[in-house]
Structure formats: C-alpha cells, structure tokens
Curated annotation (Swiss-Prot):
InterPro entries: ALPHA_CORONA_M, M_CoV
Keywords carried by this UniProt record: Glycoprotein, Host Golgi apparatus, Host membrane, Membrane, Transmembrane, Transmembrane helix, Viral envelope protein, Viral matrix protein, Virion
Organism: Bat coronavirus 512/2005
Example GO molecular function: structural constituent of virion
CDD domains: alphaCoV_M (cd21564)
Note: Bat coronavirus 512/2005 is highly similar to porcine epidemic diarrhea virus (PEDV).
Record's function text: Component of the viral envelope that plays a central role in virus morphogenesis and assembly via its interactions with other viral proteins.
Protein name (Swiss-Prot/TrEMBL): Membrane protein
Ranges for region Interaction with N protein: 201-217
Length: 227
C-alpha cells in the first residue's frame, strides 16, 4: 500500500521565489548585455556578448546530442528532433567558420569572426587600414571630415586628416565578393579641414579589400577564390 505525499505550498512558493529571483538577475544581465553590448558603448559588455554568442553553438550542440542519447529507444519523436537540431546547429556552426575565414582572407580584420558581422567596410587613410563592421553593403558611403577628424559612417577613425589625405575609393567586403566604391563627389574647406566625400558602387569582384593610395584597383590586388 502506497501513500501519497504532498509538497507543502509554503515550500513550493519558497522554491519558486528563489528561482524567480535567480532568473530575474540572469535575464536582467542578459538584457543589458544584448542591448548595450556594442563596441561603441562598452568593450567589456561587447566582449561578454561575443562570448555568449560563441558559447551558444557548442552548448546547443552538446544539449542536442545529450537529448538524442537520452531519448534513444525511449521516445523516437524526441530522438528525431534532437538529431535534427544537432544537424542544424552543426551546419550553422560550420557556415559561420567558413564565411568568417573567407571574410578574413579579404580584409585581415578580426571583425571577420564577429557572428553579427555580415560585411566589413575598409578605408585607408594616413597609412592606416581601418575596418568597420556593417550589416550589409550600402548603396553609398559617406566620409565626413570635421576639423581634421575623419568620420566613416558616423564613427571616428582618424585625426589630423587633411583634405588631400582622403582616399579615392573605399571597399566593402562580403564573404562572397568585394565591392569597390568610387568617389563621385565631395565638398571641402581646405582651410578648416572640414567637408564630406561621397562614394558609390563602382565594381565588384574577387579583390583584396585593403585600399591602396591610388584610385584604381589593379589586377594584382585580386585574390584567389577559396577552395
């Protein structure tokens, strides 16, 4: 004869209160990291956000494999879904590394390994090669010069820049191609080193994204396709 034992309501409420408090802290931290985890706000939060994104792939893959092992010969529906989720996660992880390596070969920028990065804008000024992550290839690119401070798409990239230091073109690299943006117009005040330059799409191909001082992309700048 078995007897049913009920859990006291007070104990249930106590456990729920503890779990609720813990999850409240975890979700609040996660919310702050996701909302303000941008490199222009805080490098610490940005690094924490990237660590979370990088850890999600192996964590989800491990959980899917464990679920498949636990569901084998027990629940075939759960087993099938676990195998499917493991395959999807593995494919996404492999695609991330392949696209990141392809983007790295074009830019040699560590932004290539940012899971949020789809494209990288590259510009050379004062002998420096500057890369900025962007979500996609824009129709046009604007460089703004304010009292010698160069802003690319609103981000400060260099100081002490003169009007004649502005490049003739900029590039946007994607995993599959590199888009060259030619300068088509500018308005400058040489005395105050203030003005702007506008670039539009000129051509695309298998080019190295690092711009050179000339205004023409030569064949020697082409790179081999990935094998």
């Amino acid at each position: 004869m078995s007897s049913n034992q009920s859990v006291p309501v007070e104990e249930v409420i106590k456990h729920l209160r503890n779990w609720n408090f813990s999850w409240n802290i975890i979700l609040t931290i996660l919310l702050v990291v996701l909302q303000y985890g941008h490199y222009k706000y805080s490098r610490v939060l940005y690094g924490l956000k990237m660590a979370i994104l990088w850890l999600l792939w192996p964590l989800v893959l491990a959980l899917s494999i464990f679920d498949a092992w636990a569901s084998f010969n027990v629940n075939w529906v759960f087993f099938a879904f676990s195998i499917l989720m493991a395959c999807v996660t593995a494919v996404l992880w492999i695609m991330y590394f392949v696209n990141s390596i392809r983007l790295w070969r074009r830019t040699h920028s560590w932004w290539s390994y940012n899971p949020e990065t789809d494209s990288i804008l590259s510009v050379s000024v004062l002998g420096r090669h500057v890369c900025l992550p962007i979500l996609g290839a824009p129709t046009g690119v604007t460089l703004t010069l304010l009292n010698g401070t160069l802003l690319v798409e609103g981000y400060q990239v260099a100081t002490g820049v003169q009007v004649n230091n502005l490049p003739g073109y900029v590039t946007v690299a994607k995993a599959s191609t590199t888009i060259v943006y030619q300068r088509v117009g500018r308005s400058m005040n040489a005395n105050s080193s203030t003005g702007w330059a506008f670039f539009v799409k000129s051509k695309h191909g298998d080019y190295y994204a690092a711009a050179n001082p000339t205004e023409v992309v030569t064949d020697s700048e082409k790179i081999l396709h990935l094998v």
